[in-house]
Regions:
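N-terminal Sec-pathway targeting helices
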Residues: 1-8
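C-terminal region of N-terminal signal peptides and the immediate post-cleavage residues
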Residues: 15-32
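Active-site beta->alpha N-cap acidic-glycine motif
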Residues: 29-146, 230, 239
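Active-site-proximal beta-strand/loop segments in catalytic clefts of secreted hydrolases
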Residues: 62-64, 87-91, 113-114, 150-154, ...
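Solvent-exposed, polar/charged alpha-helical surfaces in well-ordered, non-transmembrane soluble domains
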Residues: 71, 75, 101, 125, ...
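His/Asp/Glu-enriched short active-site or ligand-binding loop at hydrolase and phosphoryl-transfer sites
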Residues: 155-197, 229-241
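Catalytic grooves of carbohydrate-active enzymes
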Residues: 197-235
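Low-complexity, Gly/Ser/Thr/Pro-rich intrinsically disordered linker/tail segments
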Residues: 222-257
């Protein structure tokens, strides 16, 4: 029973661990489900923007950390028993080295490049260096394999996705932009999420903005509870409500069906 609980916790937090199969696939199932879905998405080599839209699960994702608001965001998520995913900028880990391990208690972690440059302006070799350096820093800080990648500004093309896929990372975008990076007020952030949220949504937020953290506490998490939506990490969303091939090929339109 204890091993089953460990497996469930692993999928919830995005920890990619396989239990020994000798005691049966039922016990290894949750982590295996994540690995199978990651492998499928890597073969398809298309950006993920949402889940399959067939569940009550939603994924809150936070870019550009770690930073001064990271601890507060974690406390707010913990009080609400909520899960999330943090896409980390490699160079920031030098200033906040302990944050990634703390984030793992409630969240999955992803690669958001080392310098947060527009990858469309870089050659493939430089893109690879950005991703490899950040992945190595996160894995050194946590001991956990990084399998998710998000390009800064959402600026991407098939070549960028191919570099990430060759490194074993699934490219993840979003279906809801909270507009917090544009300077939206905390009330406007909450209103934007409220207008679009549904089961299967992937929400773009930023953990280095005070107005975002306030919106998370006072508007977004209460809204999700009121609508009976459940926050999960991205690996859990992908395993429990995976997007179809047709959705992936349709891009953003595939999240509006």
């Amino acid at each position: 029973m204890r091993r089953v609980a460990i497996a469930v916790a692993a999928i919830a937090l995005g920890i990619f661990v396989l239990l020994p199969a000798a005691e049966g696939d039922a016990r290894a199932g949750p982590a295996m489900r994540v690995d199978r879905e990651i492998a499928r998405l890597l073969r398809l080599d298309l950006p993920v923007r949402c889940g399959g839209l067939r569940s009550r699960y939603v994924a809150l994702t936070f870019d550009d950390g770690p930073g001064p608001y990271s601890q507060l965001a974690l406390r707010i998520l913990a009080r609400a028993h909520a899960h999330a995913t943090f896409f980390l900028v490699g160079k920031e880990l030098r200033y906040w080295p302990r944050i990634p391990r703390r984030e793992l208690r409630l969240a999955a972690l992803g690669d958001h490049t080392w310098t947060h440059r527009d990858l469309l302006a870089l050659p493939s070799s430089a893109i690879r260096r950005e991703l490899v350096a950040t992945r190595a820093a996160i894995e050194q800080a946590t001991g956990v394999r990084v399998r998710l990648f998000r390009p800064p500004y959402g600026a991407t093309d098939s070549g960028i996705g191919r570099v990430a896929a060759h490194l074993g990372m699934v490219e993840v975008l979003w279906s809801i932009d909270s507009r917090d990076s544009e300077g939206a007020s905390w009330s406007a952030i909450g209103a934007e999420v409220a207008r679009q949220i549904r089961g299967g949504s992937i929400v773009l937020l930023h953990e280095n903005r005070g107005q975002t953290i306030r919106a998370l506490r006072y508007l977004i998490l209460p809204l999700l509870r009121a609508r009976h939506l459940i926050t999960v990490s991205l690996p859990q969303l992908l395993a429990l409500d995976p997007p179809s091939r047709a959705q992936l090929r349709a891009g953003y339109a595939g999240c509006q069906v």
